């Protein structure tokens, strides 16, 4: 017993003497310290172009810490609970480093998840907001920002994630879709990594400005839902962007499905075959309609310039011909066509296009789609979906107005006859039954005012401090500025809002308002009961886990309640930092003595 008492005391002494490595991103700061254990310890940045400050400090008996930048101390405490060697990469004046967002359930039993891409890349971690720093020649940067040409800038890009830092040289950086007539002043951007460099098995990254959506959640949420549906949709997450140390705001970082970077990651887990299949970007008119004797009828399918053997849009002809010649009511004929085209996951995409009123997608608009032919899967074609900004009621123009949400999917074929793939597929009784099963089960457990709203509110609360920063930025490029205010970021969850600059911006539906109304309409049509508690994905034992609900928290004073405790930053401290931090030498000693104490007792 005496030995156990000595061990416990020794354990306390060693724990209190621990040295912790602190890591913080502090834009526009040069003098950064950590305040802990009654002292302020200076942190340093190894790269003058990246405000990423690190350093070690003795924590003693302290339970909390905070950062000081330019003499200004953070107004809140950060918890040291669970941190034994290094903090995550904190961001100055952001109380939550790492969240605990509720995950969505998997509503489809058959092939519930897409597994060919492997585990989710850490760069798309739901619970962390990465910071992206690009540095290039200042005159070139100023030209691109002020004059918005299609010019590319070569420079250095640093990507700071939760517990790692990636840095790349010779990165090609520029405006995505430069020169379009209706671009926003907050431009969209992209970058291409050099040579064999990759990040998360990708080399091409797109940053969407999300200016159509005051909440800046809809497009990311759409991808979240599609992943829960077991599809190969593009990954997406919010990042902060800085160009030559100037803040440009929050952006949705996502795959561009028209690039082989996306195909390599989502279809081959970073290990593509020696020869890839042809990839196509579906512009307006990309509808899968057969054009006998007129190969130019497929010109809406824009071929990727890197397609093997230079395969152009003519490659769509055999697929469209086969669909045109299929007897849609015949199960055998449908089964034969499925050897050529993945109909099952195509239906999953269509379920979500319908539920979100994706007017700028395939079913309603025959646009913003794509196609890929996979040489490793008997040359099967896969439908691709993209650009999810016109969803959940954004810019929705329908003669019924708000009553459009009551329109049944059964009316879509007559309203949107150009979508020949889904419309003809629904002529098959078995496929129609499968579609309805996917639709109703998705609404019952996921797409409703219980489960999905639970995630929306948690995500909103987590992102809110950064959205306040984003709304404060005066964009430097020419283009449309709707003038959305920070208050409208929250208001548009619950109700429609009008752009202050009266120059467009169609946010006539609140995001949660839309979800609740659409779910109720489908539930009424099919007489289904929506879950009463939020549902999560299957747990390790095979049962369906309940999703955590957003907790009440301290008011931020301006945009709602901050629901995620700042102690969430300790939830991932077991992961070893790759930014150069070394594990505290006291950790093995603590573990050994703890074990000894337990044995003695």
UniProtKB/Swiss-Prot annotation:
Topology with respect to the bilayer: Lipid-anchor; GPI-anchor
Region span, Disordered: 539-581
Q: Does the keyword Glycoprotein apply?
A: yes
Q: How is it used?
A: Antibodies against the protein protects a diabetic ketoacidotic (DKA) mouse model and a neutropenic mouse model from mucormycosis infection, and nasal epithelial cells from invasion by R.delemar, and thus could potentially be used to treat the disease.
Coiled-coil intervals: none
Stretches of Low complexity bias are at: 539-579
**Subunit and partners:** Interacts with HSPA5/BiP on the cell surface of host nasal epithelial cells.
| Superkingdom of origin | Eukaryota
Lipidation, GPI-anchor amidated serine type? 579
- Biological process annotations from GO: adhesion of symbiont to host endothelial cell; adhesion of symbiont to host epithelial cell; symbiont entry into host
Protein name per Swiss-Prot or TrEMBL = Invasin CotH3
Cell compartments where the protein resides: Cell membrane
Matches recorded under InterPro entries: Ig-like_fold, Spore_coat_CotH_CotH2/3/7
Recount the UniProt induction comment for this entry: Expressed during growth in host lung and brain, and during growth in presence of epithelial cells. Induced in presence of high free iron. Induced during growth in high glucose. Induced in presence of 3-hydroxybutyric acid (BHB).
Please provide, alphabetically and separated by semicolons, the GO molecular function terms listed in this UniProt record.
host cell surface receptor binding
Gene3D superfamilies tied to this protein? Immunoglobulins (2.60.40.10)
- Mind naming one GO cellular-component term on file for this protein? plasma membrane
What is the recorded function of this protein according to its Swiss-Prot or TrEMBL entry?
Promotes invasion of host epithelial cells by adhering to receptors on the host cell surface to facilitate endocytosis of the pathogen into host cells. Binds HSPA5/BiP protein on the cell surface of host nasal epithelial cells.
> Disrupted gene: resulting phenotype?
RNAi-mediated knockdown decreases invasion of human nasal epithelial cells by R.delemar. Simultaneous RNAi-mediated knockdown of CotH2 and CotH3 decreases invasion of human epithelial cells. Simultaneous RNAi-mediated knockdown of CotH2 and CotH3 decreases virulence in a mouse model of ketoacidosis. Simultaneous RNAi-mediated knockdown of CotH2 and CotH3 does not lead to sensitivity to cell wall stress (induced by Congo Red, Calcofluor White, hydrogen peroxide, sodium dodecyl sulfate, or Triton X-100) or alter resistance to killing by phagocytes.
């Amino acid at each position: 017993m005496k030995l156990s008492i000595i061990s416990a005391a020794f354990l306390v002494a060693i724990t209190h003497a621990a040295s912790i490595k602190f890591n913080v991103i502090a834009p526009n700061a040069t003098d950064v310290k950590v305040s802990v254990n009654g002292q302020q310890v200076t942190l340093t940045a190894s790269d003058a172009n990246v405000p990423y400050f690190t350093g070690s400090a003795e924590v003693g008996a302290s339970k909390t810490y905070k950062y000081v930048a330019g003499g200004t101390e953070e107004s809140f405490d950060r918890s040291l609970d669970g941190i034994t060697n290094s903090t995550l990469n904190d961001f100055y004046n952001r109380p939550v480093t790492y969240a605990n967002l509720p995950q969505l359930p998997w509503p489809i039993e058959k092939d519930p998840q897409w597994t060919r891409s492997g585990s989710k890349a850490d760069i798309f971690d739901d619970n962390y907001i990465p910071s992206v720093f690009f540095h290039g020649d200042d005159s070139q940067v100023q030209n691109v920002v002020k004059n918005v040409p299609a010019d590319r800038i070569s420079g250095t890009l640093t990507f700071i994630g939760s517990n790692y830092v990636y840095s790349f040289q010779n990165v090609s950086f520029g405006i995505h879709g430069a020169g379009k007539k209706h671009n926003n002043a907050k431009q969209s951007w992209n970058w291409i990594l050099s040579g064999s460099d990759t990040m998360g098995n990708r080399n091409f990254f797109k940053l969407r400005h999300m200016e159509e959506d005051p909440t800046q959640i809809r497009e990311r949420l759409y991808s979240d839902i599609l992943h829960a549906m077991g599809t190969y949709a593009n990954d997406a997450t919010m990042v902060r962007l800085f160009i030559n140390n100037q803040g440009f705001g929050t952006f949705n970082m996502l795959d561009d499905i028209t690039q082989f970077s996306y195909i390599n990651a989502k279809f081959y887990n970073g290990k593509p075959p020696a020869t890839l299949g042809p990839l196509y970007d579906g512009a307006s008119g990309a509808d899968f309609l057969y054009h006998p004797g007129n190969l130019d009828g497929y010109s809406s399918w824009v071929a990727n310039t890197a397609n093997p053997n230079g395969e152009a849009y003519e490659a769509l002809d055999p697929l469209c011909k086969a669909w045109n010649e299929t007897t849609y009511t015949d199960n055998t004929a449908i089964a034969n066509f499925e050897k050529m085209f993945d109909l099952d996951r195509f239906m999953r995409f269509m379920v979500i296009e319908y539920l979100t009123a994706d007017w700028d997608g395939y079913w309603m608009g025959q646009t913003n789609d794509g196609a890929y032919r996979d040489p490793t899967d008997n040359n099967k074609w896969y439908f691709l979906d993209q650009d999810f900004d016109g969803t959940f009621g954004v810019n929705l123009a329908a003669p019924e107005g708000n009553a459009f949400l009551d329109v049944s999917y059964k009316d879509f074929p007559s309203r949107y006859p150009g979508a020949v793939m889904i419309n003809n597929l629904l002529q098959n009784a078995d496929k129609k039954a499968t579609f309805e099963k996917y639709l109703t089960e998705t609404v019952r457990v996921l797409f409703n005012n219980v489960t999905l709203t639970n995630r929306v509110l948690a995500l909103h609360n987590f992102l809110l401090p950064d959205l306040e920063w984003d709304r404060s930025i005066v964009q430097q490029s020419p283009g449309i500025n709707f003038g959305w205010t920070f208050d409208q970021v929250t208001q548009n969850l619950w109700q429609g809002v009008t752009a202050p600059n009266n120059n467009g911006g169609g946010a006539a539906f609140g995001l949660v308002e839309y979800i609740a109304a659409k779910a109720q309409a489908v539930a009424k049509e099919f007489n289904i009961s929506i879950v009463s508690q939020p549902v999560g994905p299957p747990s390790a034992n095979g049962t369906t886990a309940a999703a955590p609900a957003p907790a009440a928290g301290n008011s931020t004073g301006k945009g709602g309640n901050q629901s995620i405790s700042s102690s969430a930053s300790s939830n991932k401290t077991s992961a070893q930092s790759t930014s150069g931090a070394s594990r505290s030498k006291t950790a093995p000693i603590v573990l050994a003595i703890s074990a000894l104490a337990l044995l003695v007792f």
